[in-house]
Amino acid sequence: MLRLGSHVSMSGKKMLLGASEEAASYGSNTFMIYTGAPQNTRRKPIEELNIEAGLEHMKAHDMADIVVHAPYIINIGNSVKPETFELGVNFLQSEIERTRALGAKQIVLHPGAHVGEGADKGIKQIIQGLNEALIHDQDVQIALETMAGKGSECGRTFEEIAQIIDGVTHNELLSVTFDTCHTHDAGYDIVNDFDGVLNEFDKIIGVDRLKVLHINDSKNERGAHKDRHANIGFGHIGFDALHYIVHHPQLADVPKILETPYVGEDKASKKAPYKWEIAMLRNGEFDPDLLNKIQNS
């Protein structure tokens, strides 16, 4: 079954219930959330996440396979500042607990940045961090995200992701998030040869580890190492390639999550594109006038 959704907000008093309601308003049957603001470590206690009401709403609206995204503030690739590394490890452990409480099985993690120390040193540090953070009996997987290669990001190639996985003791607790924008920006030709890229992924990492798909177009050309998301069909990847990926038979059971930009010039009145983009990806027809329609809705 096609599980298609987007990033939604989990905030206020409604928390998980509000996230599920927002997802339902877009015609989604899955969604991704941050457990709090992605740029800080302030989090509500688990008992204030309104989980019971949220799970009831999810069940009533056929929401499943939801995904949590770890905050950007976690950088377990940092070997320069021990305090940054320790914060990352400790906060990742508490995020795993919140993810478990929410009933999610996957927590997306940007592997980390080596902050100028070189990829090998960064990867070694990430492996150490994951070995410290993972608890062998946990039922949540850390879904390492494929990165664009911006700055000193680790995880810009399938080989780097595989190197991390191979170094972790309990690597049965690791999976992968395949981000279309990041992978394109890293230099992989998902536009003309997605099957070839997926085959390469399978040989190096194993397609059975691919548990989350981030479906985003890209504002940049292939290999730009930029990581700037575009709306579906309005970037350098294009609608046809993204539609092909969303409906790929090998990835039928993988939840697909949109993280495309809100539409509009004015920050206060920007609109979420997800309802329209999800419908477009489901029915298989690209609407070149979509952005105008969203702005005028």
UniProtKB/Swiss-Prot annotation:
Cofactor binding summary note: Binds 3 Zn(2+) ions.
Keyword terms: DNA damage, DNA repair, Endonuclease, Hydrolase, Metal-binding, Nuclease, Zinc
UniProt GO MF annotations: deoxyribonuclease IV (phage-T4-induced) activity; DNA binding; DNA-(apurinic or apyrimidinic site) endonuclease activity; phosphoric diester hydrolase activity; zinc ion binding
One GO biological process term: base-excision repair
Presence of keyword DNA damage: yes
Keyword check for Nucleotide-binding: no
Cofactor(s) of this protein: Zn(2+)
Gene3D superfamilies reported in the protein's UniProt record: Divalent-metal-dependent TIM barrel enzymes
Residues annotated as transmembrane: none
Binding site for Zn(2+) 1: 69, 110, 145
Signal peptide from the UniProt entry: none
Residues annotated for Zn(2+) 2 binding in this entry: 145, 179, 214, 259
Binding site for Zn(2+) 3: 182, 227, 229
Pfam families recorded: AP_endonuc_2 (PF01261)
Catalytic activity: Endonucleolytic cleavage to 5'-phosphooligonucleotide end-products
EC id: 3.1.21.2
Matching SUPFAM superfamilies: Xylose isomerase-like
Protein's job: Endonuclease IV plays a role in DNA repair. It cleaves phosphodiester bonds at apurinic or apyrimidinic (AP) sites, generating a 3'-hydroxyl group and a 5'-terminal sugar phosphate.
Family named by the database record: Belongs to the AP endonuclease 2 family.
Protein name: Probable endonuclease 4
Origin species: Listeria monocytogenes serotype 4b (strain F2365)
Taxonomic lineage of the native organism: Bacteria, Bacillati, Bacillota, Bacilli, Bacillales
